[in-house]
């Protein structure tokens, strides 16, 4: 007897009704990742510069961060998101561009906070580059 195929049904994304949430922008020297969450921290939508097709050194540009923020904002606004608190982490070039893009997409920014981890003289940093 031939084995019957089990048909997998993909779970449909349920539309959450969240009006206020948080936007976490991680901007490194190599990439920018924007995650939009609800008040508890559960992710509603996210996007990264690399995931949008930017490769190599173009991932670290402010334009790539702007596009990532715009894409994530549009996806989160489908869940009813209207206002966000922005938490920025990292030293990358796309920090300000991503914040401006969230505002331009129609989200009201209520708070901007820098949460970049700063060591109290922890690990030894990598050696200086000589170019």
Curated annotation (Swiss-Prot):
InterPro entries given in the database record: Ribosomal_uS11, Ribosomal_uS11_bac-type, Ribosomal_uS11_CS, Ribosomal_uS11_sf
Record's GO cellular component terms: ribonucleoprotein complex; ribosome
GO BP, sorted A to Z: translation
Region (Disordered): 1-23
PROSITE patterns, sorted: RIBOSOMAL_S11
Single GO term (MF): structural constituent of ribosome
Matches recorded under Pfam families: Ribosomal_S11
Ribosomal protein in keyword set: yes
Signal peptide limits: none
Keywords (A to Z) from UniProt: Ribonucleoprotein, Ribosomal protein, RNA-binding, rRNA-binding
Biased segments, Basic residues type: 1-15
The UniProt record lists the keyword Transmembrane: no
NCBIfam families registered for this protein in UniProt: PRK05309.1, uS11_bact
Function: Located on the platform of the 30S subunit, it bridges several disparate RNA helices of the 16S rRNA. Forms part of the Shine-Dalgarno cleft in the 70S ribosome.
Homology family: Belongs to the universal ribosomal protein uS11 family.
Quaternary context: Part of the 30S ribosomal subunit. Interacts with proteins S7 and S18. Binds to IF-3.
This protein's name: Small ribosomal subunit protein uS11
Annotated source species: Clostridium perfringens (strain 13 / Type A)
Organism lineage: Bacteria, Bacillati, Bacillota, Clostridia, Eubacteriales
Encoding gene, per UniProt annotation: rpsK
């Amino acid at each position: 007897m031939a084995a019957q195929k089990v048909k997998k049904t993909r779970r449909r994304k349920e539309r959450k009704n969240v009006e206020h949430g948080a936007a976490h922008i991680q901007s490194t020297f190599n990439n920018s990742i924007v995650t939009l969450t609800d008040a508890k921290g559960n992710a509603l939508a996210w996007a990264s510069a690399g995931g949008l097709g930017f490769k190599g050194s173009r991932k670290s540009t402010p334009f790539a961060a702007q596009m990532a923020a715009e894409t994530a904002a549009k996806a989160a606004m489908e869940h009813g998101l209207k206002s966000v608190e922005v938490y920025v982490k990292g030293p990358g070039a796309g920090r300000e561009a991503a914040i401006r893009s969230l505002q331009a997409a129609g989200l009201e920014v209520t708070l901007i906070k820098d949460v970049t981890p700063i060591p109290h003289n922890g690990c030894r940093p990598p050696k200086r580059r000589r170019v």
